[in-house]
Amino acid sequence: MSKISKILAREIMDSRGNPTVEADVYLESGAFGRAAAPSGASTGSREALELRDGDKARYLGKGVLKAVAAINVNIQAALIGQSALDQANIDQIMIDLDGTENKEQFGANAILAVSLANAKAAANEKKVQLFEHIADLNGTPGVYSLPLPMMNIINGGEHADNNVDIQEFMVQPVGAKSFREALRMGAEIFHALKKVLSSKGMSTSVGDEGGFAPNLESNADALAVIKVAVEAAGYELGKDVTLAMDCAASEFYDADKGIYDLTGEGKQFTANEFSDFLGELCKEYPIVSIEDGLDESDWDGFKYQTDLLGDKVQIVGDDLFVTNTKILARGIENGIGNSILIKFNQIGTLTETLAAIKMAKDAGFTAVISHRSGETEDATIADLAVGTAAGQIKTGSLCRSDRVSKYNQLLRIEEFLGDKAIFNGLSEVKGQ
């Protein structure tokens, strides 16, 4: 009864008004699962391929009808009759059927949508919550924790139309005793920040991930204004709330000149100088996590940054590792970074995602579960964070339903777990 009887895919819209892939998986028992693939703006060059149609007369070339057809024809034919409970087999069949290193034939967006929809159908077949099923697949049944959220309240870089070079400035409500309390603290800081920006005559429009996107004189000014907002909300920076940044440094790295060009404030740095610059910010503010602090290919620079800051700051690889165990293994071996950002669609299947999380944890790295800037109402990453006891999640600000849907799912899971809901807070962050 757990066998797949039908798979149906369609083109839907993501939070940026671009098409993406949604898949439905039906089982013989009547159980059902639905999932949608997200999409990134600042992407690593080694990510699995997101298949787009390229027809400029339709959605400016961003249609996904080819990926939809791959599901409805090729993938469906290969998976009908297979047990949805064997996630590894389902994913491997799709990988083999695609036959390429980076899933370029069918697209990681097609394969991922089916992979996640299958997991949801299997959870429904077992009559368990999705996070419970994920824990079973992970080999850690019954081991759950609610993640510490990294809340992106100021957007810059590729996620906003402003002059701020660093892509994300985030708050972590480490003083909270539960996820529910952490969410409340984040929301209060978000609203306090809006008042602070308004009082300074700054824009309170939001970026792709729901954070504010004001023009500022420097990247450090973003940290300064967040400090004011934290205090205005009644919290103490460094005690109740810590800070995190996603530099997305590949986006402002000039490979020809070998420099990091912060055009918004007219400063240029070598790799080591930029790491030193980040180190000075960490001395001035309680920054406990830095993501993609250098270009994805700057491994020598990342080694310096890890040696400089890694004993006290979480050095997260996103574009650096792209949820890929082969690349992560190299980082572990060479002492590059101490944490990996986990994005389903960088690798393309749930099974490969779980493998990356396991490899990271086994090596003493942390794993931060993450959304993409182009999202949908699909909240699977909330269940992934709890079901793998990852400890941290990055899913945007405290507005836009494409972001809040993940927070709301975490609230439901916390309620479901009741007294068994574990929230470890700051101790989940590497180096803290």
From Swiss-Prot:
(2R)-2-phosphoglycerate binds at residues 167, 343, 372-373, 394. Coiled coil: none annotated. Pathway: Carbohydrate degradation; glycolysis; pyruvate from D-glyceraldehyde 3-phosphate: step 4/5. Keywords: Cytoplasm, Glycolysis, Lyase, Magnesium, Metal-binding, Secreted. Its main location: cytoplasm. It catalyses: (2R)-2-phosphoglycerate = phosphoenolpyruvate + H2O. GO terms for biological process: glycolytic process. Its EC number is 4.2.1.11. Gene3D superfamilies: Enolase-like C-terminal domain, Enolase-like, N-terminal domain. Binds a second Mg(2+) ion via substrate during catalysis. It is found in: Cytoplasm; Secreted; Cell surface. Its cofactor is Mg(2+). Mg(2+) binds at residues 246, 291, 318. GO terms for molecular function: magnesium ion binding; phosphopyruvate hydratase activity. The active site is at residues 209, 343. It holds the Pfam family Enolase_N. GO terms for cellular component: cell surface; extracellular region; phosphopyruvate hydratase complex. NCBIfam families: eno (TIGR01060). Component of the RNA degradosome, a multiprotein complex involved in RNA processing and mRNA degradation. Belongs to the enolase family. Catalyzes the reversible conversion of 2-phosphoglycerate (2-PG) into phosphoenolpyruvate (PEP). It is essential for the degradation of carbohydrates via glycolysis. This is Enolase.
